[in-house]
């Protein structure tokens, strides 16, 4: 059966890295028989330019009907102070599709160890996943700003916590079987609920070790001993901070993918970096985050584990061969990097 994939190229370098990723997808599909069709839609700044809205109605309709969604990058300086901004489209898309679970793999490629701000012995063997609750908590609570007082409400239901904890256990079960739940239960009521739910869900996963860590301690460990972690799960605010902290371990945002999952609808796959408008159109953008996001899509949405493994191995082999774009210390163009990865599939 043909799989429908909606491609949201977005802004800046987005169209360039999207096309690079789709070239890799087409190549692996030709080799393995994966049948798919691409539906390109405007989104972000491109959506505003086309329709006046960052998430056009037709784009949302196509996304709802898709089997998976690829997003490259959004954001443009021309909208920095505008009433309608590209980023509003992403928030709306997450809400409309109920994308409650954000997944960020953090893996250090040995050939890029020198880029990390940490010493080689600190980052050796780092390979973990951050699972962040994406649709609840303080970001979606009431925000009250008065003249001399302000309040932000951090609100979680049992059901919201249970589904993200369960998702994290399922991921841990297929890895090293260690789940670290991060909270601030010595202070926050929401964290007390979080820890209680984690303990209850753990009974359904006796093969997975559950550990608890306070968020301040976890932030320290992510720098002093990041290889300790296998799967991390935490609430929206803590997850936002910790996932950004984890992204600096590799020394570059150009090689890190992510996914956002709903309970029943399509998932969204995207690089963690921005639209880099300063290099848009120059043909020098690093496509690896986009390509690895496509590998995540093949594995998570379509169960094509071997295809995903082949892409990831090809990326690793390309980097090991010293073929690098400018952001990671080389001179390869977007096209040259893409062709090198395809040659190693």
Question: Regions from the language model: what does each represent?
Answer:
Residues 33-39, 175-183, 205-213, 303-310, ...:
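Flexible, glycine/charged-enriched surface loops at secondary-structure junctions
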Residues 1-5:
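Extreme N-terminal starter segment of soluble prokaryotic enzymes
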Residues 21, 25, 198, 290-301, ...:
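Buried hydrophobic packing segments
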Residues 11-14, 67, 131, 168, ...:
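Buried hydrophobic positions in well-ordered alpha/beta secondary-structure cores of metabolic enzymes
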Residues 49-154, 237:
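N-terminal glycine-rich phosphate/adenylate-binding segment common to multiple enzyme folds
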Residues 6-23, 27-29, 147-216, 228:
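Glycine-rich phosphate/diphosphate-binding loop of Rossmann-like nucleotide-binding domains
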Residues 33-57, 222:
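N-terminal beta-loop-helix "entrance" segment that forms/cooperates
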Residues 45-48, 114, 222-323:
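Glycine-rich phosphate/nucleotide-binding loop
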């Amino acid at each position: 059966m043909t799989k429908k994939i909606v491609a949201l190229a977005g802004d800046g370098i987005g169209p360039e890295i999207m096309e690079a990723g789709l070239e890799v997808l087409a190549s692996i599909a030709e080799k393995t028989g994966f049948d798919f069709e691409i539906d390109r839609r405007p989104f972000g700044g491109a959506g505003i330019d086309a329709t006046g809205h960052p998430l056009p109605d037709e784009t949302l309709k196509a996304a709802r009907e898709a089997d998976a969604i690829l997003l490259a990058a959004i954001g443009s300086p021309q909208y920095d102070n505008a009433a309608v901004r590209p980023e509003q489209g992403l928030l709306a898309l997450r809400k409309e599709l109920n994308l409650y679970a954000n997944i960020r793999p953090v893996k250090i490629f040995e050939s890029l160890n020198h880029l990390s701000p940490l010493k080689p012995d600190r980052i050796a063997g780092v390979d973990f996943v951050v699972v962040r609750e994406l649709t609840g908590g303080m970001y979606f609570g009431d925000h009250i700003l008065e003249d001399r007082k302000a309040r932000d409400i951090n609100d979680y239901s049992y059901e919201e916590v249970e589904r993200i904890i369960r998702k994290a256990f399922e991921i841990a079960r297929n890895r090293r079987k260690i789940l670290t739940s991060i909270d601030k239960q010595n202070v926050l009521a929401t964290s007390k609920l979080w820890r209680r739910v984690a303990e209850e869900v753990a009974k359904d996963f006796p093969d997975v070790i559950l550990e608890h860590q306070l968020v301040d301690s976890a932030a320290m460990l992510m720098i002093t001993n990041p290889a300790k972690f296998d799967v991390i799960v935490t609430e929206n605010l803590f997850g936002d901070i910790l996932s950004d902290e984890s992204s600096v371990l590799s020394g570059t945002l150009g090689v890190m993918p992510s996914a956002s999952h709903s309970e029943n609808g399509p998932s969204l796959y995207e690089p963690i970096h921005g639209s880099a408008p300063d290099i848009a159109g120059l043909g020098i953008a690093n496509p690896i985050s986009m390509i690895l996001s496509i590998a995540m899509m093949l594995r998570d949405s379509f169960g094509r584990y071997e295809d995903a493994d082949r892409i990831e191995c090809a990326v690793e082999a390309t980097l090991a061969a010293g073929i690098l774009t400018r952001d990671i210390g080389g001179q390869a163009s977007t096209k040259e990097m893409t062709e090198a990865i395809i040659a190693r599939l």
